[in-house]
Amino acid sequence: MKSSMNRREFLRSGVCSGTVVAIGYHVNSAAAADLKSPNEKLNIVAVGTGNRARADIDGVASENIVALCDVDANILGRAAENYSSARTYRDFRVMLEREAEKIDAVVIGTPDHSHAPDAAMALRLGKHVYCEKPLTHTVFEARTLAELAKKNRLVTQMGTQIHAGDNYRRVVELVQTGAIGKVREAHVWVSVSYGGARFTTGSPVPKQLDWDLWLGPAPERPYSEGVHPNYWRYFWNYGTGVLGDFGCHYMDLVHWALDLRHPTTIAAEGPPVDPVGTPPWLIVRYEYPARAELPPVKLTWYDGGRRPELLGELRDRHGKPLDWKSGQLFVGEEGMIISDYGRHMLLPADKFADYKRPESFIPKSVGHHREWIEAIKNCATTTCNFDYSGALVEAVLLGNVAYRSGQTIEWDAEHLTVRNSREAQQLIHKEYRKGWTL
């Protein structure tokens, strides 16, 4: 029977569903059969318009950008110059309320602490969501967004654009076809450091900035120079440190290749905990349980210049040390793979000199933003939907929980509970400022 629902009504009805698969996005064919031409453009609004958010807006510019929102009038104005037909707002809540009946999807590129309220409101309104990494500021928020997306059957994507690269796909293929045997150990490291954060006082709020809206759900406090627009990542109230910022990119590959979701034990070490600022360095040790035929995995994260000791023992095919500033190292029973965003290498180099790589089975990405757009139009799901990326972000943020609590935590993912530490449990979520809700 022919449906009387037109395409735009269909897109807004929230009927898209599907199960994520590692090789691409899965189409709900029964529902998609009713869709008209995918050439019809989506109506999209953006929350946040500066820095990375601007790249996200440009990434979906093939569609109709109907409204832009930013708490900084100067940044908003610069973005609006390129999207002159877009209506502009300062408060995302006002924008979503006024535009709800006109839009299909929302792109979110705000500081970490405001991701979840923005995304939750959009999902409850039945809008498809693209949200920058890390998906949320707390573990509880990540679980909440994943559940909302599933309940409302919406197409979601976390902004980890490295996931769309060819290099990650080739590494996943090597690991999953057994090139280095079973993997029980992995290391991830980055050289970045975000330590030394301090609030300042006495500076007036810039005229173009609505500081109250910028704070959003965070605790109320006087304006602090430098926090906006660049250094909020250094503060616990707004950011998630190096681990939250880069873990979503680098740990993504390990989660993807080894089919990881929820660790059961997390321990962290670093300098004494600063209640204000994130640490200049951190080491986190995760333990993941067995998955079907796959063995348990120990994954170690390093930042701020710390790196795995094993890295110092490795050599390339010319015998030179592998002095990689950032990367991933998979340690298998029959060899190793070292990788980063754009390269990878099988080790020992002499053992794999004549290795014949498996035939590629993960299709080339159409682009991280494009994948989300096409998934919406074809009633599909994406490779970094909130089910996959939510679990990844939960694991990433649990490293911060372990560090800040000073505890080796035993994690019950099903019940979202730290079994052995009341202090750590209090860090699974946060109290929202009056007037703000998840």
Model-predicted regions and their roles:
Residues 1-18:
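N-terminal secretory signal peptides and thylakoid transit peptides that target proteins
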Residues 16-83, 162-165, 254:
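N-terminal Rossmann-like dinucleotide-binding module
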Residues 32, 170, 182, 187, ...:
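Contiguous beta-strand/loop segments that form the cofactor/metal-binding neighborhood of enzyme cores
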Residues 87-91:
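Conserved SAM-binding strand-loop segment of SAM-dependent methyltransferases
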Residues 94-101:
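Short amphipathic alpha-helix with an adjacent loop that forms part of the alpha/beta core around
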Residues 106-107:
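N-terminal Rossmann-like NAD(P) cofactor-binding module of classical short-chain dehydrogenase/reductase
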Residues 111, 116-164, 178:
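Beta-strand-loop-alpha-helix segment that lines the small-molecule cofactor/substrate pocket
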Residues 157, 173-174, 183:
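Hydrophobic or amphipathic alpha-helical targeting/insertion segments
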